[in-house]
């Protein structure tokens, strides 16, 4: 299968820089798959799972939003956060979800509610993705 250069970058580090056969991620308009020779494209990423398929098999990452840019040279994912599913601390993510739920009950400001809802969504997504992959190992 044909490959393309994939880069995944967060504000803190370069997470990946290698060849891939396909990457599937969630954009704000729905799930999207990218393969070699995809047309140039830009999209906003949503909180969700990113699956990468290569000759070495399949990997999964948690992505907390950001942007996708597809060009002739490469596919770049500029993520707020990107964590290999194997590195997710499920118990910590569950605690983060509980804290966010408790905080939501107390909030009055719309902007605070939106930020806390995103934190809750991120924590619950981490738990879902990590638990899903633990059962497949």
From Swiss-Prot:
Q: Name one GO cellular component term.
A: proton-transporting ATP synthase complex
The membrane topology of this protein is: Peripheral membrane protein
Which Gene3D superfamilies does the record cross-reference, listed alphabetically? F0F1 ATP synthase delta/epsilon subunit, N-terminal
> Which cysteines share a disulfide bond?
none
GO biological process, alphabetically ordered? sodium ion transport
KW Isomerase (keyword) present? no
- InterPro entries per UniProt: ATP_synth_F1_dsu/esu, ATP_synth_F1_dsu/esu_N, ATP_synth_F1_esu_C, ATPsynth_dsu/esu_N
- Return any one Pfam family short name: ATP-synt_DE_N
Task: Show which residues constitute the signal peptide.
Answer: none
Keywords carried by this UniProt record: ATP synthesis, Cell inner membrane, Cell membrane, CF(1), Ion transport, Membrane, Sodium, Sodium transport, Transport
Where is this chain's protein located in or outside the cell? Cell inner membrane
Superkingdom is Bacteria
GO molecular function list? ATP binding; proton-transporting ATP synthase activity, rotational mechanism
Additional detail: The ATPase of P.modestum is of special interest because it uses sodium ions instead of protons as the physiological coupling ion.
Concerning NCBIfam families, the annotation shows:
ATP_synt_epsi
Function, in words: Produces ATP from ADP in the presence of a sodium gradient across the membrane.
Q: Which family does it belong to?
A: Belongs to the ATPase epsilon chain family.
Query: Assembly and interactions?
Result: F-type ATPases have 2 components, CF(1) - the catalytic core - and CF(0) - the membrane proton channel. CF(1) has five subunits: alpha(3), beta(3), gamma(1), delta(1), epsilon(1). CF(0) has three main subunits: a, b and c.
Quote the protein name from its UniProt record: ATP synthase epsilon chain, sodium ion specific
Q: Which organism is it from?
A: Propionigenium modestum
């Amino acid at each position: 299968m044909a490959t393309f250069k994939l880069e995944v970058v967060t504000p803190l580090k370069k997470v990946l820089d290698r060849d891939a056969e396909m990457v599937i991620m969630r954009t704000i308009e729905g799930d999207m798959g990218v393969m070699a020779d995809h047309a140039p494209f830009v999209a906003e990423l949503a909180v969700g799972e990113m699956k990468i398929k290569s000759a070495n098999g399949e990997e999964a990452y948690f992505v907390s939003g950001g942007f996708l840019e597809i060009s002739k040279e490469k596919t770049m994912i500029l993520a707020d956060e990107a964590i290999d599913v194997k590195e997710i601390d499920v118990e910590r993510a569950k605690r983060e979800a509980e804290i966010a739920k408790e905080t939501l009950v107390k909030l009055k400001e719309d902007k605070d509610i939106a930020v806390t809802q995103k934190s809750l969504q991120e924590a619950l997504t981490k738990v879902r993705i990590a638990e899903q992959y633990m059962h497949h190992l």
